[in-house]
């Protein structure tokens, strides 16, 4: 059994790149802007705003969303500073923004897209956000945008046919309690490592912003839009195995390092960690919703999952898989349309 490759979004600026197909995440950031302004205004101590202010995006990927995320933060900090001091932040604060992702992330595309009118200095920080990537007490605000949902590895036994934890599906559907517990245990461990690392890197009373998706308590993953589309990918891979295009064993051993937690699970993990206080746990209304157009859906999924499928099954099989996904999305239109909603969240944590 081969290990699951590292998950990196499709780079470049082509029609199937993550840069061109990350509007859903970007819409969440735009919808959250006012709430980010409010929580920074309320929870960021003015004493932390010095002549150098550092912001880090952990899991920045290669698309433009990271620029929206950090600009939201900078705008909020500047607004607070101007309102409470009466001084022009341009004269007194230099912003430093650190973009973190795995070393094989497409940082070239990322930096080629830097906004021309930006008011910050920037640098890449390659490395896994499950560990420390920055010096102690070196940043004032950190942000993770749709990155807190990843796990560092597949839970033990999940990909082993001889294990009682063997998962026939490519993700945690929520219908197998043993599989769900294994994924939750792995997610809890990884989340602890993330929070511990960020607590070291943040200055005292610094803020950590988490944006992403979680399940409403009691909802199973495969009852939601995101779970259904993952099921479509899995069904397409099974079809290719039946056609002899890819090996059945490879399909049955393929799982992704993703766990969409329930709201209550997230709260419990953060509270038990003890390094942060939850200052806000907001439900963000996604203005445009999920795409129901089968072609757009398939291309969007390819931008996020194409890299990992190509590494596991080969580029040709990956292309065929997403052709099948588009066809299956037509067939499952009603199921997608009536999927149970997930919660899009903004969690604001203050370092204790």
Swiss-Prot record:
Residues the record lists as binding S-adenosyl-L-methionine: 18, 59-60, 65, 99-102, 128-130, 145-147
Assembly description: Homodimer.
Cofactor note: Binds 1 Mg(2+) ion per subunit.
InterPro entries from the UniProt entry: MeTrfase_7, MeTrfase_capping, SAM-dependent_MTases_sf
PANTHER family documented for this protein: S-ADENOSYL-L-METHIONINE:CARBOXYL METHYLTRANSFERASE FAMILY PROTEIN
EC number(s) from the headed UniProt entry: 2.1.1.-
Molecular function terms from GO: metal ion binding; methyltransferase activity
Keywords assigned by UniProt, alphabetized: Magnesium, Metal-binding, Methyltransferase, S-adenosyl-L-methionine, Transferase
Primary enzyme class: transferase
Cofactor or coenzyme needed: Mg(2+)
GO biological process: methylation
Protein's name in the database: Paraxanthine methyltransferase 3
Stated family: Belongs to the methyltransferase superfamily. SABATH family.
Residues that bind substrate: 18, 21-25, 146-150, 300
Binding site for Mg(2+): 167, 252, 254-255
Domain of life of the organism encoding this protein: Eukaryota
Transmembrane region(s): none
Lineage: Eukaryota, Viridiplantae, Streptophyta, Embryophyta, Tracheophyta
């Amino acid at each position: 059994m081969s290990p699951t490759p590292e998950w990196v979004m499709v780079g470049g600026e082509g029609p199937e790149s993550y840069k061109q197909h990350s509007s859903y995440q970007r819409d969440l950031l735009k919808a959250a802007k006012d709430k980010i302004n409010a929580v920074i205004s309320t929870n960021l101590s003015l004493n932390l705003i010095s002549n150098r202010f550092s912001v880090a995006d952990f899991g920045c990927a290669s698309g433009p969303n990271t620029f929206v995320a950090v600009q939201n933060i900078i705008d909020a900090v500047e607004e607070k500073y101007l309102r409470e001091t009466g001084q022009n932040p341009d004269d007194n604060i230099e912003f430093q923004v650190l973009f973190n992702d795995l070393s094989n992330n497409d940082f070239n595309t990322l930096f080629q897209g830097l906004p021309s009118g930006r008011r910050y200095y920037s640098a890449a920080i390659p490395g896994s956000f499950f560990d420390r990537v920055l010096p102690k007490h070196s940043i004032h605000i950190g942000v993770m945008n749709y990155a807190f949902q990843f796990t560092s590895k597949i839970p033990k036994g999940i990909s082993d046919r001889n294990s009682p934890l063997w998962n026939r599906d490519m993700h945690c559907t929520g219908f197998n309690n043993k599989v769900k517990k294994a994924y939750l245990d792995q997610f809890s461990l990884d989340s602890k490592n993330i929070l511990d690392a960020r607590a070291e890197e943040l200055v005292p009373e610094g803020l950590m912003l988490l944006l992403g998706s979680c399940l409403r308590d009691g909802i199973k993953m495969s009852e939601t839009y995101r779970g259904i589309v993952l099921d479509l990918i899995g069904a397409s891979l099974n079809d290719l195995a039946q056609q002899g295009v890819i090996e059945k064993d490879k399909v049955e051993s393929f799982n992704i390092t993703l766990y969409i937690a329930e709201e209550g699970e997230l709260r419990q993990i953060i509270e038990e960690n003890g390094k942060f206080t939850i200052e806000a746990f907001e439900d963000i209304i996604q203005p445009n919703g999920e795409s129901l157009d089968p072609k757009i859906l398939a291309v969007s999924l390819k931008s996020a999952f194409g890299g990992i499928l190509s590494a596991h099954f080969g580029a040709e099989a990956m292309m065929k898989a997403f052709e099948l996904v588009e066809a299956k999305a037509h067939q499952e239109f009603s199921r997608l349309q009536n999927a149970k909603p997930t919660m899009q969240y903004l969690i604001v944590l203050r370092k204790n």
